[in-house]
Amino acid sequence: MTALVTFGETMLRLSPPRGERLETARELEVQAGGAESNVAVAAARLGRDAAWFSKLPDSPLGRRIVSELRSHSVDTDGVVWTDDADARQGVYYLEHGASPRPTNVVYDRADAAVTTLETGEFDLDAVRDAEVCFTSGITPALSETLSETTADVLDEAQNAGTTTAFDLNYRTKLWSPDEAAEVYRDLLDSVDLLFAAERDAATVLGRDGDAESVARGLADDYDIETVVVTRGEEGSLAVSDGAVSEQGVYETETYDAIGTGDAFVGGFLAKHLDGGSVTESLEWASATASFKRTVEGDIAVVTPEDVERVVAEEGDGISR
């Protein structure tokens, strides 16, 4: 049995050297990055068995994705390969900013192979047999086919007794708040553990008020066992079976903020799968996220010792 299975798109990230613009760059650094695979990598590096599945073109670009994930001990045996010449590998370009010039992201993900992935193409037993199955709101946004597949995966997992985890992860460049809300509300009925940025809950689901009221409202309305609300510099809050846990942020010198939220989820799930309480899982989530911000790339190159050191030096979890 695999502890964690994640499902979604992973893209290739192409970045010019810091201080250079995309339009003048002569070199681009290549890395892999995607919400669900970032979560799998973080959990795997923190000692949990983790797998990621998706659909990739059988090309050097698709194989580049798998090679990088495997280097971090993520199981990719469930990946569906296609030799369809029209199936592309999604790419995004990241130009690092420096005040007053903002960081700029340009996506080139249309017609990615994953957008055609149907439920019958992969082995659902991997989902049914996992302890936790995770995906995010990015996945159903990519295509109607993938939206249906996401619903099937969450339903099958929950019906089999697998804990289903979902991060709203709303992206304005993919769909409107109304489009996202319609899909999210259907999916949330099959979610046991929800991660939601405070701004996403407000923008997409119309949930205003303080973090605790937002978390309790979502938990009650959708019968979700645990709801974790992230609040940026104000930390995070979780409501689980009626009990509230809070966690502050850890001070960090930010080098690359991309992937911070995924590292948070990966850290939480790693501790959760190790039998940790919600308060302990929030500590690990916050510590993993802070450590990620010191590392280049989407992926949290972190160890359990790294997280334990951050928690030991600055732990400030609260449970009430």
Curated annotation (Swiss-Prot):
This is 2-dehydro-3-deoxygluconokinase/2-dehydro-3-deoxygalactonokinase. Pfam families: PfkB (PF00294). Homohexamer. It catalyses: 2-dehydro-3-deoxy-D-gluconate + ATP = 2-dehydro-3-deoxy-6-phospho-D-gluconate + ADP + H(+); 2-dehydro-3-deoxy-D-galactonate + ATP = 2-dehydro-3-deoxy-6-phospho-D-galactonate + ADP + H(+). GO terms for molecular function: 2-dehydro-3-deoxygalactonokinase activity; 2-dehydro-3-deoxygluconokinase activity; ATP binding. Pathway: Carbohydrate acid metabolism; 2-dehydro-3-deoxy-D-gluconate degradation; D-glyceraldehyde 3-phosphate and pyruvate from 2-dehydro-3-deoxy-D-gluconate: step 1/2. Belongs to the carbohydrate kinase PfkB family. Involved in the degradation of glucose via the semi-phosphorylative Entner-Doudoroff pathway. Catalyzes the phosphorylation of 2-keto-3-deoxygluconate (KDG) to produce 2-keto-3-deoxy-6-phosphogluconate (KDPG). Also catalyzes efficiently the phosphorylation of 2-keto-3-deoxygalactonate (KDGal) to 2-keto-3-deoxy-6-phosphogalactonate (KDPGal). The gene is kdgK1. ATP binds at N169, Y170, R171, T230, R231, G232, E233, E234, G235, G259, T260, G261, D262. Keywords: ATP-binding, Carbohydrate metabolism, Kinase, Nucleotide-binding, Transferase. The lineage of its organism: Archaea, Methanobacteriati, Methanobacteriota, Stenosarchaea group, Halobacteria. Its EC number is 2.7.1.178.
